[in-house]
Amino acid sequence: MNRLLLAGWIFFILLSVCTESFSGMVVSQTVAFHFQPHPDLSQFLVMDFTELTVPEAFIQKIGHAFSFFVLTYLLWKQRGSIRSAAAGSFAFAFFTEVLQLFFSRNGCIRDVLIDAVGIGLFYGLYVLAKRRKQEMYEKY
């Protein structure tokens, strides 16, 4: 069951990053792809954070972090290793941002960092929960 959930979540992320318009996918339930065989790869290095002042963009970036929080959890359940799950999630975050450039979307290192916030949040909560569990066992 974990494997199926993981595959479904990966499919959802890939669909979300490759479709022409994420908001079009959500609002009008339209999925369309526009492949760009020769993207401007220099766009990947753009680190413009001013976009985050737009409420819709900020909410979408929260979705980025949440998606990779969930992915890290699902990978951890599948692999059993938090470090492996975090590394796999980070590699997938990097891959999806580069992939977006080939589908007429904005893929950039800034979004990899935002994805890493979700990964780091799960990692931190995992470590915290593990410590608390260990403290409880030592206490009793």
From Swiss-Prot:
Query: What is an example of a Pfam family matching this protein?
Result: VanZ
GO CC field: plasma membrane
Note the topology in the membrane: Multi-pass membrane protein
Domain of life, per UniProt, equals: Bacteria
Q: Which UniProt keywords apply?
A: Cell membrane, Membrane, Transmembrane, Transmembrane helix
* Signal peptide from the UniProt entry: none
Q: Subcellular location, in the record's words? A: Cell membrane
Chain ranges passing through the membrane: 4-24, 56-76, 84-104, 109-129
Primary location class: membrane
Q: What induces it?
A: Expression is sigma F-dependent.
Function noted in UniProt = May be important for peptidoglycan remodeling.
Protein's name in the database: Uncharacterized membrane protein YwnJ
Question: What is the originating organism of this protein?
Answer: Bacillus subtilis (strain 168)
